[in-house]
Amino acid sequence: MKVWKRSLPVWLLTLVMLLTACGTPSQPDQPDGTETWREAYEETGAYLQAQTAPTVGSIGGEWAVIGLSRARLLSDETAQSYEQTVEDYVKQAGSVRLHHAKSTENSRTILGLTAAGYNAANVAGVDLTAGLTDMAYLRAQGTNGPIWALIALDCHGYDIPQCADGEEQTTREGLVAEILSYQCSDGGWALMGDESDVDMTAMALTSLAPYQEETDVKAAVDTALTYLSDAQQADGGFMSWGAANSESCAQVIVALTALGIDPAADSRFVKNGASPLDGLCAFACEGGGFRHSDEVWLPSRASTHWPPATASGRARHACST
C-alpha cells in the first residue's frame, strides 16, 4: 500500500552505486563545472529510465529506484512494478530476514521501498524492519551491518520492533555506539582491520549525520572529515582500494551534504580549484552514464549513484532541480 510521497532526506542518498557501461568520457565545457554537472545529471537520468524494470538486488535494483526517485524520474508504473517484485521476493524468502547472514539485504530493500513510496514495515504482511532487531545479526556483517541498518531505519523514522527472546535488542543509541567503536586510529572507517577506506568513511558519516550534534559523534565526525580532506586527490577526486573511481567521489559528496557541508565550496574539499563534484564528473560519459574508473568498464551495471550525488551538490551550487 502506498503511504507517502516519494521523498527521502538528502543525507540518505549515499546508497546508490555509480557503476555503468558508457562511451567516451564527457569533457567540462564551463570553468565552474556547472554545465557538466547538469548534463551528466540529465543524460544519466535518461539512461536509467531506458533500462529494464528494477529487480531486487544491488545491480539494477534498489540503487536505481532510489536514484530515480531522488531525481523525480521514477514513474508510478516503475514504482508499482518494483513493489510487486519485492512482495514476491519477500514471500519466497519466507522470513523477516531476506538473507541468513547479510542484514544489508533488508536495509537496502527498506531504502528502495521507502524511496518508491511504500511502507517497508508492511510488505505482503511482513515487517522488513523486524529483520534488523538483533544487534548480533547486524554485527556479524562487520562495519556494513550497523551502518546500513541505521540509515535504513532513519530513512522514514521507522520504529524498531522488539527482538525475539535470546536476541540483543537493536536501538538507535546502540547502533551509533557500535559505529563509533569501529572508527580507526587515523579517523576513518574500514571495511575490516584498521586501515581506513574512503567509501566506508563516507558511509559511516552519512549514517551518523542525524546525530552529529551529540558530543561524541561530533568529535568522530570532525576527525573523519580531516581524514577525507587529506585523502582527496589533487583533481578533487578520491581513491578506494588503490584506484581513483566514481563511487568514492559520490559517496563523499553525499556524506558531506548529509552533514550540511557544501562539497563544491568548502575549502577543505577544494583542491587546486577542483571539488568532489569535478572529480565525479571526470567519469561522466557522453550520452549518459558513468564509468567506474579510467581502467575499468563494467557493462553489466547501471549508473545509479549519480542522482543523489549530483542532486546533493547541485542543491548547494549553481544547478537547479
Regions found by a protein language model. Name each.
Residues 2-4, 22-321:
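Preference for long, amphipathic alpha-helical scaffolds in soluble/luminal domains
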Residues 11-20:
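Bacterial N-terminal signal peptides
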Residues 1-12:
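Bacterial N-terminal signal peptides that target proteins for export
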